[in-house]
Amino acid sequence: MNGNLPHIQIQSPKNSLDHLNNGRQATHNFEHGKPGDREEANGHADAHSSSGRSRYLSSDTNLLRDGSSSLDPLSKHIMKRTRSEKTLSFLNPSRASSNTHLSREGTNRSSNVTRTVSGRKSNHGSSLTDTGESDQLSLKSFGAIRQPSQHRSSLFSRMLGSTSHIFGIREDMDNESSEEERDGIPRVEGNAADPFSWIPDGKNVWDSPPKYIRVLSHNKKEKSLDHLFLAQELYCKPTLAATHDRYYEPRATDFPNLAHESSEPSSSRHTADAQSITNASVHLHNSSSPLNRTPSVISDTLAVAITSNSSSNSSNNAIWAMKFSRDGRYLAVGGQDRILRIWAVLDSEHARSVASETCSSDPNNPKLNLKAPVFSEAPIREYAGHTADILDLSWSRNNFLLSSSMDKTARLWHPVRKDCLCCFEHSDFVTSIAFHPKDDRFFLSGSLDCKLRLWSIKEKAVSFWNELPELITAVAFSPDGGLAIAGTFVGLCLFYDTRGLRFRTQMSIRSSRGKNAKGSKVTGIQTRTQMIDNIAGDTEMLVTTNDSRIRIYNLRDKSLELKFKGHANAQSQNRAYFDDDGNYVICGSEDHQVFIWDLPPQHMHKTKKKKHEHFKASVRPITAAVFAPTKTKQLLTLSGDPVYLAAISARRSSVISNASIETGPSLRNLKSLSHSYLPIEIMKGHIIVCGDLDGRIRVFRQDSVFAARKLIEKKNIERKNSETLSNSSFFPQALKAHMNSISSPKRHFSLRHKKNASQITNNENNGNDDIKKGDEPEEEHVGLRKNSTQEKNANLDPNEALKRADMMMLQEGASSMVYYSLTNLDNPGATVNEAAKTAATIEQNEHEIQTSVDPISNVKAILPNADDVSSKNSSTEDQLECLRCGNSLFNVFSRSFVFEGAKFSIVCSHCNRKLLKSGSDDGSETHEMSTLP
């Protein structure tokens, strides 16, 4: 069996412990291997296969420093190793048509330039072509991607014409035009949008509303991601010279391949044993290590490499990997500039105020304040430990971060530490990594040496490993961690038991027919467990490939459930991701767009009409796109985020006034918000983060309270029109007819009398029915309310009854396009003062209460009849409610006006508002509607 394995060229440091025994399970007894008897020439070995494996050459050190091409470096190197002429022509279609001289020269090279490495041929007698021509292939503009090939249409399609394609375009355009006509707001392309900003002009009003971007939909009547706007822009800028103290400083001795490349012979830098595997060259940076220190100067090797790279080509900032931490607090970004950056989510009022000051500190910036940021402007950590492109990232449950790179290493980080915690060396490019979902002590790595490794961080060594038949490009775990999955360059997915990495089964990710029937490179794998009514269902596996397709498989029986298309993913490392709720799948596209597909219900998985939405997100190809997790939304809510604050205000019981906008209010009500519950407006307020080929990170947010704001504005207009109606002087008909026309621009805070509804009912029934008309009764405090409300709240807890009364109140006073302002309820000083005044008033009224008189018997004309109480179909015109607060519980006091021999006044028990008062102390009273100051 070992004779059929390919001879793999391994490059490793001189002192690395790469040699293992022949067994598949790794041990700690390492021995230095001896060079084999096979021939070597210029440090390269033959690559041959007898089992249909891909042909590839060993890594070249010069390829690590090649930053001139804008193409995904991993795809470029794999193409060079596999000698895929089809892929090379795919990258530059004009190479054979537009450039005649190059085509003619390429034809001549086909017979002359082909040569072997150091004048030798492979064992199969085929020649290995020169890499000089492929090295010169460079895409100046990655945006000029290959257009879809024009296939010859069939007879049936010629008879039908191209109506289906035309109808599809019309459908998208009609959806967009109807959306603009419906809300009357023009939209711009996402790649031309500016971040939403606010310029204060002294009145605290919005200078201009945010520009919603144009979102196109397919097979959808209503868009799920309408009213998107650009909220923030972040940049991966090379700031090593200015902030070198943020970087981890590796020494030159840590990289013997780069430091001693010119002094040592090439044969001394290679390992001859083809059956050995890189395992234990692990640098643990503990407290005693000299590397665990804050650098005073920048490493010369690293500084020169980064400075020369930045000066020679300023566009080498492409983003290849982007991941949110599991707790939603951090966003890690890595890419072509070799620097790992971590941004923090604004999770407190202080962090948001600091971010606002940072945004407004630039006098040359006309936009002084970004009002909807998600992250801090500057990254909290910038690590420069890697010496080549960063390809993949993985977060653990405890916020440990793993990064894999083309420098043949995987490194361990943590945001609270300024340096690298551990370095795990491999024999080839580490293309993908994944933390174990249940145990942070283990992680899975896949590399281009066709070996799948399960590492133990505690032991700093490989626990298990296995060899695959193809180049590994993606790895993942099952949700329970019992299954390890690896995707290959030819579209093969292999499944292994995590313990021991024993092979279980495999499946081919390819189309049944057409040009993609041979399989394409797997760029990403993600698994999740379906939740149906909070019950765990089947496990799904999301697979992204380079044939511009995204597939969802059932992990139990390996059956294909869904297949999405529409985006362009031919040569990039774009990966598709689920959102937290499992309702959408998101992926970036090489045509500068972001695509979002709807996940249909389980019983509709076989439907052919796949609904999706897409929008242009940048002027460059999108290389990574993710949804912000739900925990990120919770953190933003607690920090006083303006967008989510508006959603919270739309569900609050307080009445929003037309006061000025408070940019930093005291959010005591948001502090008590449960993390397990969020309003539906916040759940629909999606956040999309995408990165492009220029290193620009764009954050798009959804205005989730757009519909609620429009409804409130409409009700405000109706309320203002109702205020012009004249008030009648007759009671109680005036009270019933004009109760709904009472409105106040400001709510008066009061402590509500927390009496149980059942206790109030007993007091009403046990009163004295005999009232002497000649006596002058003391002021009485009784409950007057609708019996239907009494029956509704009779068995409720007082706090629950008050909460329901709050939910009945109507919100009013929209103040801006996107945001609302809080009332004085969010001002602790004003709240305490109002509460103290109201408490004193209630205490004074309670001293005047006497139980000798029952005014209820004298105002029986106002109360509903017993027949009305028992009737379920009572008229709504007889209901008494205070439209200021929506309360139906009133207090009746004496000595206010004369009615059937007694003087009374009706006051709302919730907002302490006097509804009626007498015009004189004698018997001639005038009933008029009035409000308390």
UniProtKB/Swiss-Prot annotation:
Localization, per the record, is: Endoplasmic reticulum; Nucleus
- Report the PROSITE patterns cross-referenced here: WD_REPEATS_2 (PS50082), WD_REPEATS_REGION (PS50294)
UniProt-annotated stretches for the region Disordered:
1-135, 173-194, 252-275, 756-796
Q: What is its main location?
A: endoplasmic reticulum
**Out of the domains of life, which is the source?**
Eukaryota
Q: Where is the composition biased (Basic and acidic residues)?
A: 29-47, 769-783
Where are the compositionally biased (Acidic residues) regions? 173-182
PANTHER family given in the database record:
WD REPEAT DOMAIN 44, WD REPEAT-CONTAINING PROTEIN 44
Q: What is this protein called?
A: Uncharacterized WD repeat-containing protein C3H5.08c
Q: Where is the composition biased (Polar residues)?
A: 1-28, 87-101, 108-135, 264-275, 757-768
User: Biased-composition ranges for Low complexity?
Assistant: 49-59
Q: Which InterPro entries match?
A: WD40/YVTN_repeat-like_dom_sf, WD40_repeat_dom_sf, WD40_rpt, WDR44/Dgr2
According to its UniProt entry, the protein's GO biological process terms are: exocytosis
WD repeat copies, ranges: 314-353, 385-423, 425-465, 467-506, 517-563, 568-607, 617-657, 665-710
What keywords are annotated for this sequence in UniProt?
Endoplasmic reticulum, Nucleus, Phosphoprotein, Repeat, WD repeat
Point out residues bearing the modification Phosphoserine. Answer: S722
* Family matches, as Gene3D superfamilies: YVTN repeat-like/Quinoprotein amine dehydrogenase (2.130.10.10)
The record's section on Pfam families has: WD40
Q: State the GO CC annotations.
A: endoplasmic reticulum membrane; mitotic spindle pole body; nucleus
